[in-house]
Amino acid sequence: NICNDAMMVFNFLTSHIQPKDMKDLIISPNSSFEWLIKKIENEIDFAKKNLPSGIWIKCNAIVDAKLIEKLYEASNAGVKINLFVRGICCLKPNVKGLSENIIVKSIIGRFLEHGRIYVFANGGEFQSRKNNVYISSADMMPRNLYTRVEAYVPLKNETVRSQILTQVIPALINDTKNSWLLEQTGEYVKLEDKINFCSHSYFMENPSLSGQGTLSKFKTV
């Protein structure tokens, strides 16, 4: 299904034939905005039913006003939201009555952070089989949602899916060496911690993520 959907996307790019009846891929500018809104609304519904809820997003920018408003709504409903946004973020986290359940972290290190990851609890505890996990080419910006061709791809391979949930996201959460926390004032504060954990070093040295395993000889910064 994913390969067939991808073929339709490339046909769209080369011959302007609109994709029809896509099975797995969600693409911009056709449906990604509505899809993201629906995914956030689903987490709101789970929270209101006292079921596990949560959103984890890794991207380069969060700018779209309507999506930001929907994330505020989710926060007020009790959805815990972790945003790893390397660049510009127009959302204000940790504002009482608005975004108390939202944490925004910028990790500035060796990697340029072009990978985008979208994880939704989907009524299950974090790292459970219920979680919806996607990789994407798109940031949460108007140009990515409304004017460019972008894709959101569900992770069906259990190995890769597990790596995202049990290694990549936890490493981003625990990173202190290269992390800056966005405050409600719009200022970034450098995180300080005795452990000084570096997610980028972890990605390069972890056997299942780097391809090098224990063969890595050099200490990364």
Placement of each model-derived feature along the sequence:
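PLD/PLD-like phosphodiesterase catalytic module centered on the HKD motif
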Residues: 1-3, 16-22, 28-221
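Prokaryote-biased recognition of long, low-complexity C-terminal linker/tail segments
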Residues: 5-14
